[in-house]
Each structure stands twice: as structure tokens, then as C-alpha cells.
């Protein structure tokens, strides 16, 4: 996280938690000539709806406007949303939540000739994950060292 996103996370986390929400991620990006501050929030169980996001957006906007000195060098567009069904798995809390769920994993290097896997996360520890993948009509457990995981996210099984 950058200093701006860390500051935003520090501001948003208590606001979200006071409402029973969870801050999932903060992004501060420039696309074309416009800056965007994207804040992803969720609520368990059941998720967060658009009305709750709109209410939280107003609270967040007010708090960010009060920051002095202003941490944003340029005008930006504030976007609050849920992370969606295919939310990223970024931290240990996300990994624990993903246990038993269907996930997508991209790797830095190939394992068994593949750099991407989708399957059910059966187990994990600090060093590796165990993913149950379907190969044709059979299921197979694949152990993946965490240090070779480039990215991971929840996935929808078809």
C-alpha cells in the first residue's frame, strides 16, 4: 500500500467497522488523465447492498474532506463498491475465509506444466496451499508453495 492508501485505510476502517462492514481494499490510481480513489467494502454474512454503500460513501467523503493537509495532490473521483464475487485474496484473513471455497490462482512459475489453477482450497499454512482441482473427470490435490503465487481470487465454479 502507498502512503495515500494507508492513510485512507486508517480513516475508513473505523467508519466501516462501526457499521459492521469490512474494508477489503483501497486503490488510488491514475487512469488516462483522471485519478480514482477506489474503496472496496463488504459485510458478512450476505454482503453489502447499494444503499449501504451510498451511506458509507457520504461518511467517507466527509472524513476525507476534513484531512489536513490534503493527501491528494490532484482532484480525484471517489468510488465505493463491494469487491464482487471474484474478490481478490490478499491477506491471511482472506486466505482463511477462502478455505473450502472455489478459487483461482496464478503462479510466477509452472507447476505440473501449468501457471494457473482453479479449484477448492482444501488446506493452507504459512508455506503452501492445497488446492483440489478437477482434471477431466477426476479430482486431484495440488500443493502450491505460497511464494510462487502471483495472484489469487475467489472464483465462480461452472
From Swiss-Prot:
<keyword id="KW-0690">Ribosome biogenesis</keyword>
<dbReference type="Pfam" id="PF02576">
    <property type="entry name" value="RimP_N"/>
</dbReference>
<comment type="function">
    <text>Required for maturation of 30S ribosomal subunits.</text>
</comment>
<keyword id="KW-0963">Cytoplasm</keyword>
<dbReference type="InterPro" id="IPR003728">
    <property type="entry name" value="Ribosome_maturation_RimP"/>
</dbReference>
<dbReference type="GO" id="GO:0000028">
    <property type="term" value="P:ribosomal small subunit assembly"/>
</dbReference>
<dbReference type="GO" id="GO:0005829">
    <property type="term" value="C:cytosol"/>
</dbReference>
<dbReference type="GO" id="GO:0006412">
    <property type="term" value="P:translation"/>
</dbReference>
<comment type="similarity">
    <text>Belongs to the RimP family.</text>
</comment>
<dbReference type="Pfam" id="PF17384">
    <property type="entry name" value="DUF150_C"/>
</dbReference>
<dbReference type="InterPro" id="IPR036847">
    <property type="entry name" value="RimP_C_sf"/>
</dbReference>
<dbReference type="InterPro" id="IPR035956">
    <property type="entry name" value="RimP_N_sf"/>
</dbReference>
<dbReference type="InterPro" id="IPR028998">
    <property type="entry name" value="RimP_C"/>
</dbReference>
<dbReference type="InterPro" id="IPR028989">
    <property type="entry name" value="RimP_N"/>
</dbReference>
<protein>
    <recommendedName>
        <fullName>Ribosome maturation factor RimP</fullName>
    </recommendedName>
</protein>
Amino acid at each position: 500500500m502507498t502512503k495515500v492508501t494507508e492513510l485512507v485505510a486508517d480513516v475508513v476502517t473505523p467508519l466501516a467497522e462501526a457499521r459492521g462492514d469490512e474494508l477489503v481494499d483501497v486503490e488510488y490510481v491514475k487512469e488516462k488523465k483522471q485519478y480514482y480513489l477506489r474503496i472496496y467494502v463488504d459485510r458478512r454474512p450476505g454482503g453489502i447492498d447499494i444503499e449501504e454503500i451510498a451511506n458509507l460513501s457520504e461518511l467517507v467523503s466527509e472524513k476525507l474532506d476534513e484531512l489536513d493537509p490534503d493527501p491528494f495532490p490532484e482532484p480525484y473521483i471517489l468510488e465505493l463498491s463491494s469487491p464482487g464475487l471474484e474478490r481478490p485474496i490478499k491477506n491471511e484473513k482472506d486466505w482463511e475465509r477462502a478455505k473450502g471455497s472455489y478459487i483461482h490462482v496464478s503462479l510466477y512459475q509452472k507447476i505440473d506444466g501449468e501457471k494457473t489453477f482453479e479449484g477448492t482450497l482444501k488446506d493452507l499454512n504459512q508455506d503452501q496451499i492445497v488446492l483440489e482441482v478437477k482434471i477431466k473427470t477426476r479430482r486431484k490435490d495440488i500443493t502450491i508453495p505460497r511464494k510462487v503465487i502471483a495472484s489469487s481470487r475467489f472464483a465462480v465454479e461452472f
